[in-house]
């Protein structure tokens, strides 16, 4: 009788540690994705989810995680992977079909030469990403209708959402971000972002752990959006020097207080008048009722460090 060493025994300590860390990461990604799906009711019983697969780390991870969740979900839903071959020079057309066939996942490859359109319209050396994205979005909406998909799943992550918020804030003068769930402007499609709670660093590590066959995203030769790269570096620097800061900003996007901003469409400042009734959710702990002039004490001096508002010490907000 021939004895065969078990796979575990054949691994080195370093390999075993990498496997352990990878499995722990996979569980964390599944947990955060499940939480985002539940928080925003992204996937429902009977849905046909069209997962948009570009060949990048984010969309590979999205498909992998959704397939894992599909097996243990309390309700049934379908998954179909869709890739748009835009005829970019050097794009390897066989990688995604081979990968998806090996997984046994239903898929559709849509071929549309948007590259020629973009290069004809955009001057050489200019960023093509915006027009390319708009053309791609329109095609994917059409394909979703043809396939009968009820949800369109995109691989945007936490850092994408933060980056879009800051781009709109810095360069557009708007407090506008990238929602985890939206209905398309034509009112026909629901777009979801199940990786909304996942930081990019985790997706980079997951792609290395799973060894996804990554396809480069700059085959078109276009200059990547420099402003988005700048904002991305800013967020990375925060995470390095001030752990928790970017998470606090991210958390603030879901804790908006319209009465303490300035948007008259969100809050009726014009019609605002005192009611004589205390706000049950307000802070009245230090309010004084009709203080006597001679009993009012001096103003309280702030002990907060310079440049830091009272009580606003930076801390990381942890989702549970």
From Swiss-Prot:
Pfam family, one: ATP_bind_3
Any one of the GO CC terms: cytoplasm
UniProt-listed GO biological process terms: tRNA thio-modification
Catalysed conversion reaction: cytidine(32) in tRNA + S-sulfanyl-L-cysteinyl-[cysteine desulfurase] + AH2 + ATP = 2-thiocytidine(32) in tRNA + L-cysteinyl-[cysteine desulfurase] + A + AMP + diphosphate + H(+)
Signal peptide limits: none
NCBIfam families: PRK10696.1
Similarity annotation: Belongs to the TtcA family.
Function noted in UniProt: Catalyzes the ATP-dependent 2-thiolation of cytidine in position 32 of tRNA, to form 2-thiocytidine (s(2)C32). The sulfur atoms are provided by the cysteine/cysteine desulfurase (IscS) system.
Note: The thiolation reaction likely consists of two steps: a first activation step by ATP to form an adenylated intermediate of the target base of tRNA, and a second nucleophilic substitution step of the sulfur (S) atom supplied by the hydrosulfide attached to the Fe-S cluster.
Name assigned to this protein: tRNA-cytidine(32) 2-sulfurtransferase
Record organism: Bordetella bronchiseptica (strain ATCC BAA-588 / NCTC 13252 / RB50) (Alcaligenes bronchisepticus)
């Amino acid at each position: 009788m021939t004895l065969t060493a078990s796979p575990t025994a054949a691994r080195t300590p370093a390999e075993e540690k990498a496997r352990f860390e990878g499995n722990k990461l996979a569980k964390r990604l599944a947990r955060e994705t499940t939480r985002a799906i539940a928080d925003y009711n992204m996937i429902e019983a009977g849905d046909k989810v069209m997962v948009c697969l570009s060949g990048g780390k984010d969309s590979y991870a999205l498909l992998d995680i959704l397939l894992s969740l599909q097996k243990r979900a309390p309700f049934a839903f379908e998954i179909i992977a869709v890739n748009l071959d835009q005829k970019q020079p050097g794009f390897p057309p066989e990688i995604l079909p081979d990968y998806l066939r090996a997984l046994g996942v239903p898929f559709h490859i849509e071929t549309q030469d948007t590259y020629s359109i973009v290069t004809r319209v955009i001057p050489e050396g200019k960023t093509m990403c915006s027009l390319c994205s708009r053309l791609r979005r329109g095609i994917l909406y059409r394909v979703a209708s043809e396939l009968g998909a009820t949800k369109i799943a995109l691989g945007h992550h936490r850092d994408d959402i933060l980056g879009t918020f800051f781009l709109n804030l810095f360069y557009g003068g708007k407090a506008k971000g990238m929602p985890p769930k939206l209905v398309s402007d034509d009112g026909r499609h629901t777009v979801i972002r199940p990786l909304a709670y996942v930081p990019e660093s985790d997706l980079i590590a997951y792609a290395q752990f799973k060894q996804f066959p990554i396809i480069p995203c700059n085959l078109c030769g276009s200059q990547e959006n420099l402003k988005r790269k700048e904002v991305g570096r800013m967020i990375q620097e925060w995470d390095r020097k001030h752990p928790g800061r970017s998470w606090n900003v991210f958390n603030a996007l879901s804790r908006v207080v319209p009465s303490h901003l300035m948007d008259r469409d969100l809050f009726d400042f014009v019609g605002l008048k005192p009611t004589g009734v205390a706000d049950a959710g307000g802070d009245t702990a230090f309010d004084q009722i009709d203080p006597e002039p001679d009993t009012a004490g001096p103003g309280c001096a702030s002990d907060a460090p310079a440049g830091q508002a009272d009580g606003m010490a930076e801390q990381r907000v942890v989702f549970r």
